[in-house]
Structure formats: C-alpha cells, structure tokens
C-alpha cells in the first residue's frame, strides 16, 4: 500500500513543459492534500525548487520539502526569503536537499552551489533540520548511491561528519515517521546497522566500503 504522498508542487528540470520556478499548486490545494493525507495517517513530501512553491508548501504544513533550491526570478538559489524560512521553521518542516555524488564536480567552481550552501547555512542557523537524500531515479543517480553522496552533501551544507550521519539515520527516520523503530542502535529498535573498516565520524568516505550489513539483527551482505 501507499505509505507516503509526494506532490509536484512546482515544475522540474526533467519534466517536459514545466518550469522549476513556477508553482503548480496554490496553498489552498496543497492544504487540502495535506489534510486528506493526514486523515489517512500519511505524510506528504513536496517537490519544490522555487521560492513561491516553497512558501505554499510550508504554509500548507507539508512534512518534507524536497530540493528547496530557492529559485527566484533572478535565478537558482537567488530567491532566498527570510519570511519563508521563518515559516518553515515555525511549521517544523524537514528539508531534503537531494544532493547526490555528481554534485562533487561543482564544488569550488559553481556560484550556484556557493549560494545554495549559504542558504543552507542560514536554514540550519534558524533551526531547520536537513536530511540526506539523492533524488534517486533521475538519470545517473541510483538508489544505492547515498554512501558516496553523503560526503558531498556534508561539504556543501557545512555539516560535520557526525551531523551528516544523523541526517541519514536518526533524523531521516524521524522525518519519515520511523523514528520510534529505526535510525538508531538502541533497545527495541530494528537492529539495522552497518560495519566499516574505519570510523565514519572521522571520515565519511569509509561509507562507500561496508564490511557487513545487518537488517533486523541478521547479516544480509558481506563485502
């Protein structure tokens, strides 16, 4: 069955006939979607590149904002709005930046990435929690790519290694409604964990070479 609703609140880069800066749904419709989903115990994620759609989604009480690229009429990452940020913070909305490992080629040579990093810093200072994600399914981004994406995400978002790890585990589990059963190693939880030949709190690159994977306490993959 369905356990989460995702709405394309704005246009996308690979969606024919759409523009990332244009809102596809107004706040009233998004609020109706959120209210209906909540009646069925479901969370709602909203694809939002532009500030107009981010504002509508935040006002509607969306659970997670995917991308949150702050696209304005002046360009990508140039539509940052402190009032919209305050709304995101007030609503307790999680932000999922969808930074994959391919972004590594932009680090240090992209005004957009520099602007975006500054925006994420402002968001974190305001108390917004960022969760690790990759937008898997788009061209050249596979569903198992998070381990190589996490160091890139940490660099762009200004996260320490331990903060990046939380964004992919305990924080992420909480954001998608699994905080009571997964995302941590503790009594009563699902016992999903990975062993590495190294300390990922010191070096996130070790995530790309797991030694052993356990699911619900049982080994499922050996290197």
Model-derived regions, located:
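Divalent metal-coordination and catalytic microenvironments
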Residues: 1, 5, 37, 47, ...
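Conserved strand-to-helix beginnings and helix N-cap segments that scaffold or border functional pockets
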Residues: 78, 143-147, 207
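His/Asp/Glu-enriched, well-ordered alpha-helical/loop segment
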Residues: 114-199
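Active-site core of metal-dependent hydrolases
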Residues: 8-118, 126, 131, 137-138, ...
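C-terminal cap of metal-dependent C-N hydrolases
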Residues: 170, 187-223
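Residues embedded in well-ordered beta-strands within globular domains across many folds
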Residues: 6, 66-69, 165, 195, ...
